[in-house]
Amino acid sequence: MSMLRLQKRLASSVLRCGKKKVWLDPNETNEIANANSRQQIRKLVKDGLIIRKPVTVHSRARCRKNTLARRKGRHMGIGKRKGTANARMPEKLSWMRRMRILRRLLRRYRESKKIDRHMYHSLYLKVKGNVFKNKRILMEHIHKLKADKARKKLLADQAEARRSKTKEARKRREERLQAKKEEIIKSLSKEEESGKK
């Protein structure tokens, strides 16, 4: 059997692939051995004596299956973990995500006039101070603040109404007393006049 190293090298150059991807027909070794130029190699390729092997299949099916399982939380237990908790999910990244979510919510509420700029500013600072763990807690806090504000306003209005009512009653009572005094004075003056006559 003759050496076909040259032919393999030329074939890999002609077929634009690696030498291990070149298949030389073992039944036609003599004919292949006679070919010592690229032109002759091209002819052999055309005749089918030299073939480029297909790409080896490297399936990702198992990998996809495992990835789907991991999304469900499989193969992610204590024994499978290599890095620290901070390496697996950086605290800074989770903090940034939380800040962006909460600040976006505050901005949206301010633009839609659900909260005024004073409340926005105080809540913004509280968000920065790590008061709210997530969006739901912040929303509940805002609703509570608004309810408290409405309740205070209602109580203030009721107190004001009560004050004005008592004021009016006092005024009417004073007017009645004044009118009574005037009547008494008038009746006394009339009696005095009749007594003089």
UniProtKB/Swiss-Prot annotation:
InterPro entries given in the database record: 60S_ribosomal_eL19_sf (IPR035970), Ribosomal_eL19 (IPR039547), Ribosomal_eL19_CS (IPR023638), Ribosomal_eL19_dom (IPR000196), Ribosomal_eL19_dom1 (IPR015972), Ribosomal_eL19_euk (IPR033935)
Keyword list, A-Z: Cytoplasm, Ribonucleoprotein, Ribosomal protein
UniProt superkingdom: Eukaryota
GO biological process per UniProt: translation
Pfam family, one: Ribosomal_L19e_C
Comp. bias (Basic and acidic residues): 159-197
Listed GO CC annotations: cytosolic large ribosomal subunit
Keyword set includes Cytoplasm: yes
CDD domains from the UniProt entry: Ribosomal_L19e_E
Region (Disordered): 157-197
Statement: the UniProt record of this protein carries the keyword Transferase: no
An annotated Gene Ontology molecular function: structural constituent of ribosome
Role according to the record: Component of the large ribosomal subunit. The ribosome is a large ribonucleoprotein complex responsible for the synthesis of proteins in the cell.
Family membership: Belongs to the eukaryotic ribosomal protein eL19 family.
PANTHER family assigned: 60S RIBOSOMAL PROTEIN L19
UniProt name for this protein: Large ribosomal subunit protein eL19
Originating species: Xenopus laevis (African clawed frog)
